[in-house]
From Swiss-Prot:
One of its GO terms (cellular component) is mitochondrion. It is found in: Plastid, Chloroplast. Signal peptide: none annotated. It comes from the Eukaryota. This is DNA-directed RNA polymerase subunit beta. GO terms for biological process: DNA-templated transcription. The gene is rpoB. Belongs to the RNA polymerase beta chain family. PANTHER family: DNA-DIRECTED RNA POLYMERASE I SUBUNIT 2.
Amino acid sequence: MVNGCRVRSNLLDIQRNSFRSFLKKGLVEELRKIKDIAHEGFRISFQTDNVKYKKPKISAEFALKNGETYSLSVHIPVEVTYNNMFLVRNKYILFAKIPLMTEKGTFIFNGNKRIMVNQIIRSPGVYFEKNRYNDSIFATLIPTFGSWLTFKIDQDEGIFVKVDKIKTAIPLINFLKCLGLSRKKFFLYLNDPIFIETLQESESYGIRLEFFEFYKIFFPNEVNVRFGNARKFLRSKFMDPRKYDLGEVGRFRVNTKIYRSEFFQSNRTLQPEDVLGIAHYLIELKKGMIPFDEIDDLKNKLVRSIGELLQSQFRIILNELESSLKEKLIFLYKNPSEKTFRLSRFFNSYFITNRIRKFFSVNPLSQLLDDTNSLSELTHKRKLSPFGPNGLNKERTKLDVREINTSQYGRVCPIETSEGKNAGLILSLAKDVRVDKYGFLESPFYKVLRGKIETNKGIYFISSAQEKYFTVAPFDVFRSSQSNLLDKNKLLGVKRSKIFSYSFSKNIDFISISTDQFTSLGTGLVPFLEHNDANRVLMGSNMQRQSLILLEKEVPFIKTGREALINRESDATVLAKSSGKVIYSSLKKIVIQEEEYCANIEFFNKNYSFFNLLGCLNEISQKNFKLIKKVNQKIYFLESPKKSNHGVYIQKIPIVHEGEWVRKGQIIADGMSTLRGGICLGKNVLVAYLGWEGYNFEDAVIISERLVFEDIFTSIHMKKFKTFIVNDEKKGENISMFIPNASLKTIKNLKNNGIIKIGSEIKAQDVLIGRIKVKLKNTPKNKMLIAFFGNKVRKDVSLRSPRSLVGIVTSVEILCKKSNCSVLIHVAEKRRIQIGDKIAGRHGNKGIISKIVPSIDMPFLPDGTPVDMILNPLGIPSRMNVGQVFESLLNLSSLFLKERYKIQPFDEVQTSMNSKSFVYKKLNEARKRTKKDWLFNPNYPGKAFLYDGRNCRPFDHPVAFGYAYILKLIHMVKDKIHARVTGPYSSVTQQPLRGKSKNGGQRFGEMEVWAIEGFGAAYLLQELLTIKSDDVLNRSEALFSLINGTYFSKPNIPEAFKLFILEMQSLCIDIKIFTNNYKKFD
């Protein structure tokens, strides 16, 4: 229980606490398992209790800029002895380098921001299920690490055991005998006639046969197996704590499931009694006496964050290290000539460091940070993925796993998930969820006692396993102002034992702390979400993460209260770590003078202001009172403009001024997607729901020229160009501004060293770095050119800007590592909105811009204000996202009343139709205050007669209009549209390559052929399939025919058809091509 009436959501505590726990406990626990490594008198001892960590030598910003890894060093003292004589005594060695988590939960790896996605997997323990297809009953025993065991009972009530994914099964009795179960215990617990008969039959063969049978499952081709090796293999497989561990959670769940009292609390390996208890439980399930487990309940799943994932990876790495050290000890023992023992040759930190780097590079849970905006960054850090080590297989996921479970309430958002093949698998954590020390999700609740909400008793965090014993109610049940539940005799909606039902207030034990605690961050930003279909809210949540940062930022008129929470935890903002006075503020840094007063009293509130503190001190008696003032300066360095992982321009801007007093936790610098503590993802624009000349058919959108020319939806993007400098005449390459055959326009912005100037405006094919390569080969052609011109043959290999890029150079950096130097150039590009760009609202209403209309031709309001955007009204009834109508109308009243609103979801606690009445009330208030009667007409509320801008005539019917918060998404037409005149061809089919990255061409596919056939254009179709495609002979002659004005040759056989014939011949089908004269065609 947490003291206090309100819970403060710490959105990134899961990652921070997990990584901190790994450094304090997890790493030491794994090191203790290889504390001593010995062989023939040699002994290596790691003093695991004295592990030391050293801070990184470079800053996080330096690592980002130079493409390095921001990591800490792990140092461990080592002792090496030989026959009790010290060769090395208590010497610290560099054990490994581990990437260090930043304050915002990210890792800087090779100059890129990465995160480790939280993994949600089945908790260690035993689970009993029923196969829905063949009605077979099976149990699965899952350890923390080690082999999985599957127990299956067949129709004859015989139980068989499978190990991991091996298809071969062995009888349960044989497996129990291998584990060492006595005959007495077997008859005592499994007194079943079938098992007794099977046991008597197996006793005639002896116990050795069972060991050999088990060993053959793993090594079927091995012969001459010794009994000792087979027994040793089984014992190490399930009874060695270093290779098999149920874990604290797994042992507890096994004990509570199959034992009446908790046995083997300290022993976490597999015991024969565990297997015997599972078999007994299966027999009871076969008789129908006990229920099956619900696998998808959150009580059976736990969350593994970065700390647990790193610890499991270290377990594997340290086992490899132990084997490597043992091999080196054996080599040292067999080669006594090696008299001097060198620890540096014996142990190398790169052995572990390289494997950790591979873990961060290859693991599917390690991903590049989605930093398109503040919301996308935080949502990515709070994702839950079932994939990864010991997780689900993408190709074998069942529908049951994707469905919403009742235990997810308040723990996992039931709305926000991925769209497509990962729908229902990639989830997002709820706002106020907490993870306990074992990895189970907990949701906060208030205690309810005899119908009264006890808010003063604090908040209770309850897991899914604990919740089944209580009756919980949502926050939006009807209640009075005194926090008592209304009407003790009225039935209220509650949840009890995973079932939603109705109950009286006296039976309720807990109640939710807010109406939006079950939603994620993105879902909570959608106002009036209760009036939308869940699928559209899902789309709105996902598209907010895809919204671009605009040049002119604007906060929405309607907020939900999540904005401040997101900004506080986002990496885009900078928070003051203590109170003080700003003495310097610029784009590079902010300096705050921290002033602390120390006396014989203690100030508990660290957020005190300067004047309040002096006021308090004046009230205190000054007798025997000494006041000491401590002054420190804290410097906050702001990151220079840089490119995000998705090519978005990122910069931090200070919002405090010199002489201003700031308090602890206050935002002192804004990011590109924040404005004074508010999150800015789009713009408030005037929209009308109207069909206009068919241009907004099927979700197409019509916009005004004003949005283009006034840069309303203009965004800034960053391109990065990197090249290596080889300024060596011996190798025939150098950099220079004097480039052969280059026009003056393309090199006018170069400096004398051949590198472009900062602030230069570049266009298509401008030279960024001038590079010249001299041909050193003395070929006859080069000798002739030298004899004619007297100079060596030089080739232009300069770095040039792409054809579609127009921008400004923002930074030029020369990075040198040892003998290699590279140049990094950043170019900022300003993109206006254009036809083909994708826009969306917060309610899943998305569309593509189809036409840009002059402002004078757009429909206008009765007061002459032209509409900025025209949306299709038919997109609302079928999609059932009415929330956008509420938002647009309330935004309209917000503009005229000069008010801002905070809307909580599910606000109809006291009265029904609360949203509708509130919007109509504000519209009517705006009408009275502005004396504009068209703002609210009782006959058609929310609508007015608009006028056509082309002829100034009113439309036939009233039109709904208002201000909507519209987002510009990252799916821009400039990144997708592509065309080519010439380009590469495939060497096999002789057809153009596919894809924009390869400068490919557009293929004329099967459906396009059908379209041409439908019009009967036979000659056009023949030309498209031959000369314009892969008729190589006529394709090369087409240019000469066009120049000379002659007719094209007769079409030849295309290469694709020849390839088809060759493939048929490869299948031993004798097929050939002949001409009209029955001549074989090659």
